[in-house]
């Protein structure tokens, strides 16, 4: 088997396993629309997030720890390129690339509640002083710009990408805490991604593939 054929088979296998896991939990959460809407298995699927970046200026923001910084930087890039450099917003494409703890920002409220992610990530809901049972990044955060949220940035064309290796790691860690079987937890996570999120086999390989196609790279993780 040639390298290209082997690569195609591997991609089909990844996407088929993902679709099975998500379909098995369709009653618990929403399957990411980009994965559900397109036929699975085509070699281009793993690069679908790159394909949608058609502007003259394209950049990916890599975040591992502090997800909020990627939201603020996405907002600032779009605003400042438009207001200070005269670049039409449609010509400035931003992709937020997440792995590690940062993937919490792209998991829906149902998964936060079902898997007790607030307790796992040590996120406290200020209104209850208890572990959070919802994803705070989906609505305006006190003290932050009201438009620095995942839905608002998606509306402005920002692409959000999650690493599947990180999802597998998280599922194993939650299972080790007594949360259930790792494969079942993974299925919940995959089905519970915020609709519109792209799940890629490996984040670093995906970023390298994007750089090869001319997408700039910025590391946006910092204390905030």
For the regions a language model picked out, list residue spans one by one:
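C-terminal segment of N-terminal export signals and the immediately downstream linker at the start
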Residues: 29-57
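A glycine-rich helix N-cap at a beta->alpha junction
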Residues: 116-139
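Acidic helix-start/capping segments at beta-turn-to-alpha-helix junctions
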Residues: 87-111
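Histidine-anchored nucleotide/phosphate-binding helix
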Residues: 70-87
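Loop/turn elements at helix/coil->beta-strand transitions in domains of secreted/extracellular proteins
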Residues: 56-58, 90-94, 155-159, 215-216
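Glycine-rich, aromatic-bearing surface loops/beta-hairpins
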Residues: 175-224
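N-terminal secretory signal peptides
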Residues: 1-10
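Solvent-exposed loop/turn segments at secondary-structure junctions
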Residues: 65-69, 100-105, 160, 165-170, ...
């Amino acid at each position: 088997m040639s390298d290209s054929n082997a690569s195609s088979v591997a991609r089909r296998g990844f996407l088929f396993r993902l679709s099975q896991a998500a379909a098995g939990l369709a009653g618990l959460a929403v399957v990411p629309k980009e994965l559900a809407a397109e036929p699975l298995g085509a070699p281009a699927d793993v690069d679908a997030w790159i394909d949608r970046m058609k502007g003259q200026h394209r950049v990916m923001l890599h975040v591992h720890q502090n997800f909020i910084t990627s939201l603020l930087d996405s907002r600032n890039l779009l605003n400042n390129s438009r207001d200070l450099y005269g670049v039409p917003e449609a010509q400035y494409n931003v992709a937020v690339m997440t792995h590690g703890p940062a993937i919490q920002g792209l998991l829906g409220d149902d998964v936060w509640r079902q898997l007790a992610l607030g307790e796992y990530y040590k996120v406290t809901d200020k209104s209850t002083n208890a572990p959070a049972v919802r994803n705070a990044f989906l609505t305006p955060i006190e003290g932050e710009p009201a438009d620095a949220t995942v839905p608002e940035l998606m509306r402005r064309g920002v692409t959000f990408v999650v690493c599947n290796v990180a999802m597998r790691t998280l599922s194993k860690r939650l299972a080790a805490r007594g949360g259930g079987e790792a494969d079942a937890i993974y299925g919940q996570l995959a089905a519970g991604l915020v609709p519109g999120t792209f799940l890629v086999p490996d984040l670093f390989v995906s970023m390298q593939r994007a750089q090869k196609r001319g997408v700039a790279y910025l590391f946006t993780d910092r204390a905030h």
